[in-house]
Amino acid sequence: MGQKIHPTGFRLAVTRNWSSRWFADDKAFGSMLAEDIRVREYLKKKLKSASVGRVIIERPAKNARITVYSARPGVVIGKRGEDIESLKADLQRLMGVPVHVNIEEIRKPETDAQLIADSISQQLEKRIMFRRAMKRAMQNAMRLGAQGIKIMSSGRLNGIEIARTEWYREGRVPLHTLKANIDYGTSEAHTTYGVIGIKVWVYKGDMLANGELPPEAATPREEERRPRRAPRGDRPDGGRPGRPGGRGRGPRKADAAPAPEGE
């Protein structure tokens, strides 16, 4: 059976960039990578209500710069910036270096794969039917500009005895195309029946190697490709064009004079 490769790892150095951007020697690499994982887990738990999509970690010259992409930046910042100051203090204590925190707003959370997966997992934990949650998320994404979306849920769906996998797709999701801008996100719903995993792929169009969108190809519109027919009143005899004598295709040609009887 063919297995699905991670869309982001497949496109690294082509159209996507790393989420952790720093250099380290062989001895320090493992500890710094484990530190990044702890930071992301802490932010995911701390900012659960802030709809956090991506977290980018950079380490310039014995410092750390963390960029948090959130659909609700006001929840992260808090009143008069109190929450972000406490968050910065916790991150400095966790990483042991001065930390700068930047908050970026996600303009269209309905087309962000990670936010879609988190939203579906929260609905499943509230006992909402998984098909309804998946189809509603797909409709919202397509309505707001996504060219394709695929959602997969695995586990004891609706509390059945045997776990199964169900998926829905709308539009195009070209996973083999390197220039395709595929956004990928995963989440888990902890229900009373067990854990349900959610995977989301969102296709947002093609990208060039520098991350820019290519110019639109000049494709003829559907109306231009389709030949236009003349109105029925403008045709001779008011019939439809076509081969003579065909059923419903206009008048027959004048037949040859019938042979006289008796021949």
From Swiss-Prot:
<keyword id="KW-0699">rRNA-binding</keyword>
<keyword id="KW-0689">Ribosomal protein</keyword>
<dbReference type="GO" id="GO:0019843">
    <property type="term" value="F:rRNA binding"/>
</dbReference>
<dbReference type="Pfam" id="PF00189">
    <property type="entry name" value="Ribosomal_S3_C"/>
</dbReference>
<dbReference type="InterPro" id="IPR005704">
    <property type="entry name" value="Ribosomal_uS3_bac-typ"/>
</dbReference>
<keyword id="KW-0694">RNA-binding</keyword>
<dbReference type="GO" id="GO:0003729">
    <property type="term" value="F:mRNA binding"/>
</dbReference>
<dbReference type="InterPro" id="IPR036419">
    <property type="entry name" value="Ribosomal_S3_C_sf"/>
</dbReference>
<feature type="compositionally biased region" description="Basic and acidic residues">
    <location>
        <begin position="219"/>
        <end position="240"/>
    </location>
</feature>
<comment type="similarity">
    <text>Belongs to the universal ribosomal protein uS3 family.</text>
</comment>
<dbReference type="Pfam" id="PF07650">
    <property type="entry name" value="KH_2"/>
</dbReference>
<dbReference type="GO" id="GO:0003735">
    <property type="term" value="F:structural constituent of ribosome"/>
</dbReference>
<dbReference type="InterPro" id="IPR009019">
    <property type="entry name" value="KH_sf_prok-type"/>
</dbReference>
<dbReference type="InterPro" id="IPR004087">
    <property type="entry name" value="KH_dom"/>
</dbReference>
<feature type="domain" description="KH type-2">
    <location>
        <begin position="39"/>
        <end position="107"/>
    </location>
</feature>
<dbReference type="InterPro" id="IPR015946">
    <property type="entry name" value="KH_dom-like_a/b"/>
</dbReference>
<feature type="region of interest" description="Disordered">
    <location>
        <begin position="211"/>
        <end position="263"/>
    </location>
</feature>
<dbReference type="InterPro" id="IPR018280">
    <property type="entry name" value="Ribosomal_uS3_CS"/>
</dbReference>
<keyword id="KW-0687">Ribonucleoprotein</keyword>
<comment type="subunit">
    <text>Part of the 30S ribosomal subunit. Forms a tight complex with proteins S10 and S14.</text>
</comment>
<dbReference type="GO" id="GO:0006412">
    <property type="term" value="P:translation"/>
</dbReference>
<dbReference type="InterPro" id="IPR004044">
    <property type="entry name" value="KH_dom_type_2"/>
</dbReference>
<dbReference type="InterPro" id="IPR001351">
    <property type="entry name" value="Ribosomal_uS3_C"/>
</dbReference>
<protein>
    <recommendedName>
        <fullName>Small ribosomal subunit protein uS3</fullName>
    </recommendedName>
</protein>
<dbReference type="GO" id="GO:0022627">
    <property type="term" value="C:cytosolic small ribosomal subunit"/>
</dbReference>
<comment type="function">
    <text>Binds the lower part of the 30S subunit head. Binds mRNA in the 70S ribosome, positioning it for translation.</text>
</comment>
